Every structure is written in C-alpha cells, then in structure tokens.
Amino acid sequence: MDDVATRIEHTVLGPTTTPGDVQAVLDTAIETGMRACVPPYCVSMAAEYAPGVELTTVVGFPHGQHTTANKADEATALAEEGADELDVVANLGLLRAGEDESFRRDLAEVVAATTRPVKVIVEAPLLDEDEKHRAARLATEADAAYLKTATGFADGGATVADVELLSTYLPVKAAGGIDSWEQATAMFEAGAERIGASSGDAILEE
C-alpha cells in the first residue's frame, strides 16, 4: 500500500480552493505518503507547511492558452517557490490548427525553463486518435518527462485506452475522474506510473 501511495498525487485544483483546503490535502499526504498537487498560488505555503511531501503544481492551467513566455516564466517561478514537479497544459489550439512545430516549441520552452520534471497535459478526452498520437509525439520531442491524460475540467476522464496509447511514448500520469481503488488499479495495469486524484485518500481506504 505504501508503494501505491507514492504513485498517487492527492489533488486539489478547484476554482474555489482555499489555503485551508490545501493544508488538509497536505495533512493527508503526510499521513499516507501520497504526493500532492496544489494550485500555483499555494506552492510557497505548501512547501513550507509540508517540506517532506513531493509537491506538484500546474502551469498554464486549465486551458494551456497562455503565451509561451508566460508559461515559461510561471514554470521558473513555481520551481523556485518549491514545486518538485510541474504539470503544464498543452495548447490544443495549436495542435488542432496543425501548427505542430509551434505546439512542440511551446512545450519545449517550458521544459527548458526549469530543471524540474515536466508532465504535459494533453487533455485526451478532447482529442481524436491522430491528435493523441501527435500530441504525445511532440511532447516527447519537447523532452517532457511524463504525459498526463487530462486536467479533470473537460468532459470525460482518464480511460484505459488512453493510458495504453500514451504510455507507448512516455510514462503516464492518469487523471480525470479516478475516484475508486478499482479505477486506480485499472489505470496502473494499463501502464500508468502515476495517478492524479482528488479522492486519493478514499482510494487508499478501500
């Protein structure tokens, strides 16, 4: 169970998330050994409050349509504030428009802006099969460390099929609608290395 806990990022990223909500997630992470994924504005507080917890935050969240310079600056700042890993949202507008090099460069500049591992959120529920492959290939070429299935804000969540597809390119963080031990197990069996879930504590309690 301890090994499973270290592969779960207990997540709190809702639009009304308070510092108190983040502290509650961190308390659970401390107790269970889970990682935590918190909003950018709480990174500094979280790093000070729970220095032993592996801390992830998000960049360009939730739509990925910030300018590349803004994303890169955000990544640099959040790493300096204490984030151990960064989940950056890909710009799907560029992908959908067929501007593959611009899509890749947007991600590559974020990766280059920090020494922290960068996971690229491809928002798989919004993509067709060709777009999933292109997004995964281009993120790989941008030197991403992981692919992440979704932000959790789009309709549809993580699927076994998407994890299987994406894991042929890079390690995968499955996220979006995972709230049970059965779902988590299915994602791990499909090849996910990590899971992001707002119900991390409930998953471990089953």
Model segments located where?
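Short, well-ordered coil/turn segments that N-cap beta-strands
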Residues: T32-M34, P51-V53, G82-D84, T114-V118, ...
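Hydrophobic faces of well-ordered beta-strands that scaffold small-molecule active sites
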Residues: V4-H10, A36-V38, L55-G60, L86-V88, ...
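Active-site-adjacent beta->alpha loops and helix N-cap segments on the catalytic face
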Residues: P19-G20, V38-E54, Q65-N70, G93-A113, ...
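Glycine-rich phosphate-binding active-site loops on the catalytic face of alpha/beta enzymes
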Residues: F61, E80-L94, E141-T159, A174-E206
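Conserved, mostly hydrophobic/aromatic
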Residues: E9, A46, L78, V120, ...
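Helix-adjacent hinge/juxtasegments
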Residues: A75-V88, F103-L107, V111-A113
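Conserved N-terminal beta1-alpha1 strand-loop-helix module at the mouth
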Residues: M1-E81, R134, L138
